[in-house]
Amino acid sequence: MFVDKTLMITGGTGSFGNAVLSRFLKSNIINDIKEIRIFSRDEKKQEDMRIALNHSKLKFYIGDVRNYQSIDDAMHGVDYVFHAAALKQVPTCEFYPMEAINTNVLGAENVLSAAINNKVTKVIVLSTDKAVYPINAMGLSKALMEKLAIAKARMRSPGETILCVTRYGNVMASRGSVIPLFIHQIKQGKELTITEPSMTRFLMSLVDSVDLVLYAFEHGRQGDIFVQKSPASTIEVLAKALQEIFGSKNAIRFIGTRHGEKHYESLVSSEDMAKADDLGGYYRIPMDGRDLNYAKYFVEGEKKVALLKDYTSHNTKRLNLKEVKELLLTLDYVQEELKNA
């Protein structure tokens, strides 16, 4: 897939960037690929990654997706782009919604426009379950990012830049997520702070996140959105599983939902489920290719009506305590924390 090609990863020093680079470095992909460009704004994280990975095919570019010129300059000669740069903390985006817009919407506009300008072959845009029926600023900004990508995809001619979207559930042990928080609280002997015990979240590993992007990269057509089917758990069961893994008897305190949080998340809306292709472990949501000539649709009508429910963390496979423990123990992050406990 990547033979003699140049790949750019925006936000490349984040959790996804580290995971995909780890995959590439452990496989033959790193031997086949021409160059991987890490584009991000944090020079310290770039320096740490440069030292830790120490590979001649990794090139580092300081820049911000908010600045079109910096992303356009860095994208010269790039064949493929994984767009992972984002503001993703829900409460932070609630307090600073314009910052979410500047990065997640306008930044995405810059990345997509630069990719088209530089005749990039394919772009995979990383989105989130919070973009489906959004109630918070982060989800709204990601929903608009998806709309931007699909709108631009709709305007592309055959042979031009292919734009696809991947939509994640909760990525376990990613930076700023609840699993590192719970483990920190356990190790410090503090109370485990749970927002709402019956709240459910999809459980997706960083390995799964890389699998999803590579699947979309291999199979994506113009304007496709890809979702990976994932199990879910309540937050309370997740906390108790970590307690058992670490042999902790820390008290649990319920603190109530944070700003902008939903009781459960949706990965596919009921409207999208009506047109989604079931690909086994994934759903593909094809682009709506209709134009603005609506008159004919009043005559022809819709071919399909949404008869299905949305795909949510409430109606997907729900893991019990034993199953959550088994899943958590497959995570490198949890194993490393156990060694250092």
Swiss-Prot record:
Disulfide bonds, paired cysteine numbers: none
Name of the protein in its database record: UDP-glucose 4-epimerase
This protein's encoding gene: capD
Similarity-based family: Belongs to the polysaccharide synthase family.
A single MF term (Gene Ontology): UDP-glucose 4-epimerase activity
Role, per record: Epimerizes UDP-galactose to UDP-glucose.
Classification via InterPro entries: CapD_C, NAD(P)-bd_dom_sf, Polysac_CapD-like, Polysaccharide_Synthase-Rel
Enzyme class of the recorded protein, top EC level: isomerase
Catalyses which reaction(s): UDP-alpha-D-glucose = UDP-alpha-D-galactose
Family annotation (SUPFAM superfamilies): NAD(P)-binding Rossmann-fold domains (SSF51735)
Protein's UniProt keywords contain Nucleotidyltransferase: no
Alphabetical UniProt keywords: Isomerase, Lipopolysaccharide biosynthesis
A biological process from GO: lipopolysaccharide biosynthetic process
Taxonomic lineage from the root: Bacteria, Pseudomonadati, Pseudomonadota, Alphaproteobacteria, Rickettsiales
EC numbers: 5.1.3.2
Pfam families linked to this entry: Polysacc_syn_2C (PF08485), Polysacc_synt_2 (PF02719)
